[in-house]
Regions:
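Conserved catalytic cores of very large enzyme subunits
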Residues: 2-734
Length: 734
């Protein structure tokens, strides 16, 4: 086949196996970043228009709304930013930054956003949809138990995708470039033909889904043909490879509105095409960088209609679009020149929250690449780092969880409010703010002094009930999502039979742990209202705090996580999904805190909870390394969806010279991951910078920071979210 000329290997030519293609053809790069080029003239023209549009968008929230057509892979006319200058084409609608309504997920709430922004959606289109279909948000409330409704209303368990798209699915968009869509359709037809023996409910459902996938692949071909491209065949050069890949991602965007839409781990794959083109004399380094820069620009143009509730759950208005960089095979890294080119787009296009670059860190990374990443971190707080699991095609799904591309999918199971769990243990299963009964069988504690043994016993009862409800909640949501808003194109680019996982998060861990430490190692008095509900707590002695490398409190943290996972692992989940637990928050620490009473650790009523695995703000005062050592004691074996850790470091703590700072960043990352760390993101800044951004938002429109596994534009946060980020520990010593 002409498109595969000079490519090595045979297995990948006979079956779908992108890993085999990469391992037979990629070239590890260990050199420096000296080869990189700046922005091309064409890219400069494209990005200049985007910057103006983004600036305008920031003043009015939503720049434009499609009010005649609903979402769909092939539902919109072509869209361009600057047609003559674009080398990678395609937009989610016919104009840049123009959002659409996805009726299959959240019709009525989206139409309210449309109305609030001064638009009126075509009534006939809405009525036709309602006559023949239903939105997830319309039907899902009827399927909830009363317990689920109560837990959602009281902010005990939230964040599940019942009024937004699921997201977190890593699809193998590379397959389009390597094989062409016709090959993929033929493979799906072959799979469909095999699904005909011993017909039962499971096989019927799979057959129905495969048919939807085939239809989506045909829609994908049609959408690409509008732009003048025939993606039925494999890509024949680097430009086509990136364009084909992008068309797949764009199709996913057009039928979705998920919180996270990961792109995968694409740099080694694309690099193979770029290196072949450079060798053949049809591509220069400047043109190679131009391809990557313009691909990144397209990712930065993705927008969805977001409800106020969504913005409370997830920080920032833009979706989490994660591009993973790294990987290891046979003691050799998957770092290529294109890994550098992706990160160089930050320099060329300036800092942004998209893509969410995730670096898989390991001892096998070339030293020069470690240096380059550290230099990027010093100048821009945009990278996150994860411990490499040493697989070829592993990609980050959203914040810290990883999946094998094309082989596994994650269902998001929401986050549990651990601070509420503690207060229910203290208040006999009653909600501390409303007084209504929430959990039965919890022994009331009427004494003014809290006894650790009684609290611990009650906490186990509370957690069992909360996990029961969370499991039911997740199973219902994903059944309804599959039935009414199935992600046809994303699943079409995965194996027909995939490993399914369901991921759960816990929020407020350090609040719970510090509170239990206070109860165990201090004398904690409870203040109660006239109904006997706790309103405040007073600790009469100092007590050990999580984040200071103190075994007595760090063990409490480890035991809590193990207990949570032990209970969770006894549950059965939708489509036999395997459970994964993560310590993360996705921004829900703020909304949870705003609906949670005072806690025994000294946290005031309605104050935000700590983010993810972070210690409580400003109590981890023994230095950065002590804080990280506490986190390293958390049981990573049961937290297979990640332990999200965000740290703020003042520049002076890293050294007075740039070379010293770079060396210290590398040392921090090497030591943390060598000792079993899972995830780490660094904000290198002074608190005053955060305060300046808080008080002068219009001057800091491009101020980006890291939080809970995401790069976030500070100006896109609510005031409560900004407050929670300003009030963080800023480590001045290592």
């Amino acid at each position: 086949m002409q498109e595969w000329l000079k490519f090595k290997g045979k297995k990948w030519q006979q079956i779908i196996d992108v890993d085999d293609f990469i391992l037979n053809n990629y070239k590890e790069y260990k050199g420096s970043s000296d080869f990189l080029k700046g922005m091309s003239r064409r890219t400069n023209k494209v990005w200049a228009r985007c910057e103006k549009l983004i600036e305008k968008e920031s003043t009015i929230s939503i720049l434009d709304i499609e009010d005649s057509y609903f979402s769909g892979i092939d539902n919109f006319e072509n869209g361009y930013i600057d047609k003559k200058s674009e080398v990678i084409v395609g937009l989610q609608t016919d104009e840049p930054l123009k959002v659409f309504v996805n009726p299959f997920i959240c019709l009525d709430s989206s139409l309210q956003v449309v109305k609030n922004n001064g638009y009126r959606f075509d009534k006939d289109t809405v009525n036709r949809f309602k006559d023949f279909s239903v939105s997830v948000e319309d039907i899902i409330e009827d399927t909830y138990t009363e317990d689920i409704k109560k837990f959602r209303r009281l902010h005990v368990i939230e964040g599940l995708p019942d009024n937004y798209g699921r997201g977190f699915i890593v699809s193998d968009y590379r397959r389009i470039a390597l094989y062409g869509v016709d090959f993929l359709i033929a493979k799906k037809l072959h799979d469909l033909d095999r699904l005909k023996k011993d017909i039962n409910y499971s096989i019927i459902r799979t057959r129905e889904e495969v048919v939807k996938q085939i239809n989506a692949l045909n829609d994908l071909k049609s959408m690409a043909s509008r732009y003048g491209y025939n993606i039925s065949r494999p890509a024949k050069n680097a430009r086509e490879a990136l364009q084909w890949l992008y068309f797949g991602f764009l199709a996913a965007v057009k039928e979705n509105n998920g919180a996270s839409i990961p792109t995968g781990n694409n740099s080694p794959f694309i690099d193979i095409y770029i290196e072949r083109d450079i060798e053949n004399g049809i591509l220069t380094e400047e043109l190679a960088q131009e391809l990557i820069d313009q691909f990144v620009i397209k990712l930065r143009m993705v927008r969805f209609i977001r409800t106020p509730m969504f913005n409370d759950y997830f920080m920032g208005k833009t979706p989490i679009i994660t591009e993973t960089i790294g990987g290891v095979y046979n003691n050799q890294s998957l770092i290529t020149k294109t890994a550098y080119r992706f990160l160089n787009s930050i320099e060329n296009l300036d800092v942004d929250s998209i893509p969410n670059f995730s670096i898989l860190w390991s001892n096998y990374l070339p030293d020069n690449f470690k240096i380059y990443c550290s230099k990027i971190m010093l100048e821009h707080n945009v990278l996150e780092f994860l411990n490499d699991d040493l697989t070829v095609s592993s990609a980050v799904t959203g914040t810290s969880g990883k999946s094998k591309i094309g082989k596994q999918i994650d269902y998001y199971g929401g986050n549990c409010n651990l601070a509420k769990a503690l207060l229910y243990s203290i208040n006999g299963g009653l909600d501390e703010l409303t007084g209504e009964p929430v959990i039965e069988g919890v022994e009331p504690i009427s004494t003014s002094n809290l006894e650790y043994s009684k609290i611990a016993k009650n906490l186990t009862i509370v957690l069992k009930k909360m996990i029961d409800i969370q499991s039911d909640y997740a199973n219902i949501v994903h059944y309804i999502q599959d039935k009414y808003s199935y992600e046809s194109i994303q699943m079409a680019l995965n194996d027909t039979v995939v490993e399914r996982y369901i991921t759960f998060g816990i929020t407020g861990l350090s609040t719970l742990v510090d509170s239990l430490s206070a109860i165990r190692y201090s004398n904690v008095l409870v203040k109660r209202d006239e109904n006997g509900l706790s309103t405040d707590f007073q600790s009469q002695d100092k007590f050990p705090r999580f984040g200071n490398d103190l075994d007595e409190v760090d063990k409490i943290a480890s035991d809590i996580v193990k207990l949570y996972y032990k209970i969770l692992s006894t549950k059965s989940f939708y489509r036999n999904a395997k459970v994964k637990l993560g310590i993360d928050s996705n921004g829900m620490n703020v909304i949870y805190g705003k609906n949670t009473g005072a806690t025994p650790d000294g946290r005031f009523k309605l104050v935000a909870l700590p983010s993810a695995a972070n210690p409580t703000s400003n109590v981890d005062n023994s230095g950065l390394f002590a804080s990280l050592k506490s986190i390293l004691k958390l049981p990573s074996k049961v937290c297979t969806n990640g332990i999200v850790t965000t740290v703020n470091i003042t520049p002076g703590a890293l050294g007075s010279k740039k070379t010293e700072s770079v060396e210290n960043i590398i040392s921090i990352l090497d030591n943390y991951f060598e000792n079993g760390g899972n995830h780490l993101e660094l904000n290198i800044l002074e608190k005053n910078e955060m305060l300046q951004a808080f008080n002068n938002g219009n001057k800091y429109s491009n101020f980006v920071i890291r939080n809970s596994g995401c790069a976030i534009k500070y100006c896109n946060l609510t005031s409560d979210q900004q407050d929670s980020l300003v009030d963080r520990t800023y480590h001045k010593v290592l």
